């Protein structure tokens, strides 16, 4: 594995550009679902009541607000990769979001993690370029309350859930045999593109965030096998939108956390 860059000082200088609400930006509710893929985004939006008439544009993503079970909830997406996901998350926090679930796909790195299973990241090995710009205590972890809600909601639906480490990369076409073996040895369950950066920003800004990743393909045997048409993958994606919204709206954000730029 490549050497890590030198650690940044924990008290970083203030950025010259800070995310903030402009005159044309709407206020957003406390709860938000970040959805990486267009089809899953539409499935999540279909479950909201009393939605806005049209979405608000946020960088390359759309934002829609409605109610789920009586709770005002924002759904944002699609998005691809750490830089875009962090831009959207940073702006969403500036507009009022405090409790976030990220919904995406991942590749399996372990034989016991099957296509159609769900991984709840507990930590992420960063091989993306965004999280290094945010000085935080390492390793960063997801919100305990959101993890508890996710486990309960997904297990109640009969889904197979694995909680563990993931590998976040900027280069899916450079997932080499050597890297896969190295991250397998470190115990990583899956590989994806966004979670290391999202968890880091959530820690830096002191908001609650967790992720749920559907296993879409398999690298565990050092041969790529996709499952994009696998019935198990399709069924899990069908079940997840409602289960994630249930977990997201089950509780309010942690009372001891307020957005910060000091980690």
Predicted regions mapped to residue ranges:
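Generic non-transmembrane alpha-helical segments
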Residues: 47, 149-157, 201, 243-251
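Flexible, glycine/charged-enriched surface loops at secondary-structure junctions
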Residues: 52-57, 158-164, 251-257, 261-262
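His/Asp/Glu-rich mid-to-C-terminal helical/loop segments that flank catalytic regions of hydrolases
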Residues: 221-257, 261-263
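Zn-dependent metallopeptidase/amidohydrolase metal-coordination segment
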Residues: 196-232
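Short acidic/polar active-site loop segments enriched in Thr and Asp
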Residues: 98-99, 189, 208
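Active-site rim beta-loop-alpha module in soluble metabolic enzymes
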Residues: 139-186
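Metabolite-binding pocket within alpha/beta catalytic cores that recognizes anionic/polar moieties
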Residues: 1-149
